Amino acid sequence: MGTICVTGTASGIGAATKAKLVAQGHRVIGVDLRDADVCGDLSKPADRQRIVDEVNALCGGVLDGLVPCAGVSTPVPNELIVRVNFYGTLAIVNGLRPALEKG
């Protein structure tokens, strides 16, 4: 089985995805604001880069999959939705692309 990074693992779809992947025998690197292997705020550019760096360190630069489940929705401000759901996801996908290419 492979090593897979899942964002949003503290609750909801991210938590369920992590549980399913672990049950299938995968190693999961969870990312969330808290209660995760890598904790950080995807709305903040500095945290995005740190998350990428920490995931890369944990996976040894080789990642077999990425499931970006982290996200927010109303009633939070639209600006926060865009920062997390768009820019946060884009930064994680782009930042982990080299590790995914090796997996």
Predicted segments with their positions:
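Active-site loop of short-chain dehydrogenase/reductase
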Residues: 2, 61-63, 100-103
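Amphipathic alpha-helical dimer-interface segment in Rossmann-like NAD(P)H-dependent oxidoreductases
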Residues: 79, 84-103
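Conserved NAD(P)H cofactor-binding loop of Rossmann-fold oxidoreductase domains
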Residues: 67-75
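Conserved hydrophobic beta-strands of the Rossmann-like cofactor-binding core
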Residues: 3-6, 66-67
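Conserved Rossmann-fold cofactor-binding substructure of NAD(P)-dependent oxidoreductases
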Residues: 43-60
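N-terminal Rossmann NAD(P)H-binding glycine-rich loop of SDR-like oxidoreductase domains
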Residues: 10-19
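Cofactor-binding loops of NAD(P)H-dependent oxidoreductases
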Residues: 40-43, 70, 84
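Rossmann-fold cofactor-recognition segment
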Residues: 31-47
